[in-house]
Amino acid sequence: MNYSHNEIEKKWQDYWEANKTFKTSDNLGQKKFYALDMFPYPSGAGLHVGHPEGYTATDIISRYKRMLGYNVLHPMGWDAFGLPAEQYALDTGNDPREFTKENIQTFKRQIKELGFSYDWDREVNTTDPEYYKWTQWIFIQLYNKGLAYVDEVAVNWCPALGTVLSNEEVIDGVSERGGHPVYRRPMKQWVLKITEYADRLLEDLDELDWPESLKDMQRNWIGRSEGASVAFDVKDYNEQIEVFTTRPDTIYGASFLVLSPEHELVDLITTEDNKDDVEAYQKEAAKKSDLERTGLSKEKSGVFTGAYAVNPLSGQQVPIWIADYVLSTYGTGAVMAVPSGDQRDYEFAKTFDLPIIEVIEGGDMSKEAYTGDGPHINSGELNGLYNEAAIEKAIELLENKNAGTRKVNYKLRDWLFSRQRYWGEPIPVIHWEDGSMTTVPEDELPLLLPETDEIKPSGTGESPLANIDEFVNVVDEATGMKGRRETNTMPQWAGSCWYYLRYIDPDNEQMLADPEKLKHWLPVDLYIGGVEHAVLHLLYARFWHKVLFDLGVVPTKEPFQKLFNQGMILGEGNEKMSKSKGNVINPDDIVKSHGADTLRLYEMFMGPLDAAIAWSENGLDGSRRFLDRIWRLLITEDGSISNKVVNNHSKALDKSYHQTVKKVTEDYNSLNFNTAISQLMVFINDCYKAEEIYKPYIEGFIKMLAPIAPHISEELWSRLGHDETITYQPWPSYDEALLVDDEIEIVVQVNGKVRAKINVSKDIAKEEMEQIALDNEHVKSEIEGKDIKKVIAVPKKLVNIVAK
């Protein structure tokens, strides 16, 4: 008889909810485990089969740790602000609040139907004023610490979306969402000073149990490099151009300077003859994304300004060009171009027929730039020195002339924090008519997002909030001074920077979270989510955490101790699942046809957790067959427990059971769920072969299955006569001594030919081995009537009988 998944799964989900089975205790004396999922954005499409892969993994570990006696914090919530809900509201005329609320209900239903053991009393929602009150509070702390400031920056302006986008939201010159054209334009923006934490963000990666590849992505994003800052005087102007270079030793080969089209000196130093060309070039550059501008394969373009700078060491005059491959947001927005030592400069020099001065021996300047080591030439006091010594000497010479200094540079930019949208947290700042700026008093938080039907972007660069007079205009009651509220909102990243902290104390109205509770639960022990968040979310969350650590709010330097990226589930043809391809699989359909336990089991059995693997209907069916097999082994047609399950200890399954406990325990600890399931299958095969199954062994098996397939496990546990949920039952243990067989197989030979194989005790004496061999029926018939000359017994291996 196969089991009815619909009936059983509903029954146990109702039981868990009614009994609050997974409620996290506030017992701070118990050992803890904090298992965290990257909370989802509740889109209109609902869950797809990719979501449950990571969620199932954390759920297995959460259920496993509860059985090991841990107090487990395993929460879920919603990252619900952001562009998609607003875009939907614009397209349909619906309120993003309603849309978001409905989507959350769908997601929550789907998640509950998959049997995940979340403590729903700790649910958070980034759009709830009681939540974003504390997001705003953190912003105020950043502001007070000098880490939030207003700056005029060249931003990615998307007219179609009516907002500024971060660099990460722009791909190949168009918006990631919707594919609309994006242009560069200067605008006043809120910026967070993440660069102040660059060194700590880099150094503390070493202490984390994260995939090395992911740590490298963060290291590259931060991009620390050592070198020198060098000042070039601009000829005929009382101005200097500062450049950063990692190779100050090549300064004698600097045959021109290149400024970004947005550099502040461009308009000042451009000569009358070159003005039209320069302005036309600036306009074109404004239409390109940073990625397009810096692509290595693109044609080199640029324009001469007509101005010259003076090389501080050689005294040579060098022309000043502008080119879009230099970004105003990176370094100083100016580079010292050394065509003989940098391939991009080399190609630029070749394109515009600029001088190429060889300064390091070893290359062929007619073919390409030389980036290797070698003795310096044409380099004044640096001649004859190799790279390392030449770098030190060059810095010394520059410092002596007050023309440069040793410097560390970062690729990391400060975080552009404001968005010209409606659906986000209001930034709690007031701009007063006297030009001053204050934050909203903390006792007035949350600063509520006003409800309005008019959420279209203003198109001026201001957010839709600028259209709501009663929100914008304020008067200081004490002085009568008028002010305007900040109308930009925070990016979606804001709420997701700290949500893991709020789960720890979600109902606290007095503070972000109780310090004692934070001390107990932090850091997060296991964080599972997609690799697409490797840099941004994880870097931003680490930054905020470090600020909160400095403020004494959190007790740890880092938020997430162990991090794991689950792989992607692909469509059957190894293609990414997408609506346009029509290959998206809805978990609701699988839960209905095969059951939640089958889906959980299948997604963990597909392969290693971090691999990208194609969905297979056959694999899904196979997982269901395994659960049916377990059911049929233990439950008879009338629904009672099979009489194969016995209370007296037959030793037949000792080795198989203890091996299974050992293997599954090790595999759960290392997140190798696919091989754990294989071992559970081996044990069930052995149970089918056995005449009897010792009841404690089948109970231990059900405990091991429960983290993966909790519904069928609860049902079997209950039918075995237990009144309580399996959730908090102790995890099975294994005996090393029983991992090896009591019996071994030995070979019996007569005159060198194998005549029998027999099982004997592994501790059997030689004499007894010989006697058992001689008593064997096959051997007897072989030696009948013959004279036994010799019997040779090799312990644990064989008995050889020589008979004539």
From Swiss-Prot:
Motif ('HIGH' region): 40-51
Record-level GO BP terms: leucyl-tRNA aminoacylation
Motif ('KMSKS' region): 576-580
Top-rank taxon, per record: Bacteria
EC number: 6.1.1.4
Annotated compartments: Cytoplasm
Reactions accelerated catalytically: tRNA(Leu) + L-leucine + ATP = L-leucyl-tRNA(Leu) + AMP + diphosphate
Keywords associated with the record: Aminoacyl-tRNA synthetase, ATP-binding, Cytoplasm, Ligase, Nucleotide-binding, Protein biosynthesis
Binding-site residues, ATP: 579
Keyword Nucleotide-binding assigned: yes
GO cellular component labels: cytosol
Single GO MF annotation: aminoacyl-tRNA deacylase activity
InterPro entries in alphabetical order: aa-tRNA-synth_I_CS, aa-tRNA-synth_Ia, Leu-tRNA-ligase, Leu_tRNA-synth_edit, M/V/L/I-tRNA-synth_anticd-bd, Methionyl/Leucyl_tRNA_Synth, Rossmann-like_a/b/a_fold, tRNAsynth_Ia_anticodon-bd
PROSITE patterns, sorted: AA_TRNA_LIGASE_I
Chief location of this protein within or outside the cell: cytoplasm
PANTHER family per the UniProt record, alphabetical: LEUCINE--TRNA LIGASE, MITOCHONDRIAL, LEUCYL-TRNA SYNTHETASE
Protein family according to the UniProt entry: Belongs to the class-I aminoacyl-tRNA synthetase family.
Record-given protein name: Leucine--tRNA ligase
